[in-house]
C-alpha cells in the first residue's frame, strides 16, 4: 500500500469516526459488524451486493426511525418508549402528560441529517466502495477524504441549531426533571 493511500484511508477513518457520534450506536455497530460479512470483505458477487443493499436500507431506516422515538417514566417508575406523533407519544399513557413530546420540525431535520450521515458512512466504507464501485479512481479517493468532514461540520451545525431533546430507544434520559413536571 502506498503512503498516499494510507494517509487518505486514515483521514477518512478519522472523519467517519467523528460522524458516527451523530448516529444511533446500535445501528452503526450492526452495519460495521455485518458489512464485512455481507460484502465478502469487498469482493462481491451479485448476491453480496443485494444483501449489502438491504442492510444499508434497513440501517438507514433505523437511523431515521430512532429520531422519532422517545421515552418517559410513569408514576410506578418504569421507563416506557413510544413514537412521536402530532398529539404526543404513541402508545399513550394515562399517568403522564405526553403532549410535550409531540412531533416537531427538528425531528424531521434530525432524521434527514441522520440519513445523510449514515449514507456517507455506509457508502464510503472501504468494503462497500470495493463492492459497489471498485474502479474508484484518484478523484474518488479525494472525494472519500473530503466528504466525511464536510458532512460532519454541516450536520454538527444543523444539530446545534436543532438540538434534540428526545431520548429514544436505547437512550433513556435521567427523567428527573422532565417527567416530574409531566405527571398529572
From Swiss-Prot:
Domain of life: Eukaryota
Membrane topology classification: Multi-pass membrane protein
InterPro entries the UniProt entry points to: DMP (IPR007770)
First-listed, main subcellular location of the protein, grouped into a coarse class: endoplasmic reticulum
Tissue-by-tissue expression: Expressed constitutively in leaves, stems, flowers, siliques and roots.
GO CC annotation terms, alphabetical: endoplasmic reticulum; endoplasmic reticulum membrane; plant-type vacuole membrane
Keywords: Endoplasmic reticulum, Membrane, Transmembrane, Transmembrane helix, Vacuole
One BP term from GO: endomembrane system organization
Task performed by this protein: Involved in membrane remodeling.
Family as reported in the entry's similarity comment: Belongs to the plant DMP1 protein family.
Name this polypeptide is given: Protein DMP2
Gene: DMP2
Amino acid at each position: 500500500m502506498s503512503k498516499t493511500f494510507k494517509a487518505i484511508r486514515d483521514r477518512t477513518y478519522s472523519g467517519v469516526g467523528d460522524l458516527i457520534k451523530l448516529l444511533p450506536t446500535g445501528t452503526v455497530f450492526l452495519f460495521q459488524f455485518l458489512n464485512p460479512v455481507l460484502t465478502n470483505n469487498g469482493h462481491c458477487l451479485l448476491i453480496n451486493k443485494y444483501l449489502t443493499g438491504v442492510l444499508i436500507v434497513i440501517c438507514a431506516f433505523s437511523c431515521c426511525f430512532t429520531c422519532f422515538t422517545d421515552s418517559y417514566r410513569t408514576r410506578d417508575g418504569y421507563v416506557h418508549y413510544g413514537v412521536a406523533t402530532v398529539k404526543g407519544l404513541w402508545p399513550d399513557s394515562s399517568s403522564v402528560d405526553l403532549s410535550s413530546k409531540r412531533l416537531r420540525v427538528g425531528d424531521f431535520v434530525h432524521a434527514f441529517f441522520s440519513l445523510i450521515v449514515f449514507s456517507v458512512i455506509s457508502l464510503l466504507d472501504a468494503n462497500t466502495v470495493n463492492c459497489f464501485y471498485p474502479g474508484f479512481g484518484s478523484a474518488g479517493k479525494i472525494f472519500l477524504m473530503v466528504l466525511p468532514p464536510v458532512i460532519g461540520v454541516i450536520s454538527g451545525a444543523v444539530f446545534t441549531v436543532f438540538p434534540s431533546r428526545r431520548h429514544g430507544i436505547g437512550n433513556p434520559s435521567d427523567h428527573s426533571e422532565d417527567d416530574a413536571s409531566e405527571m398529572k
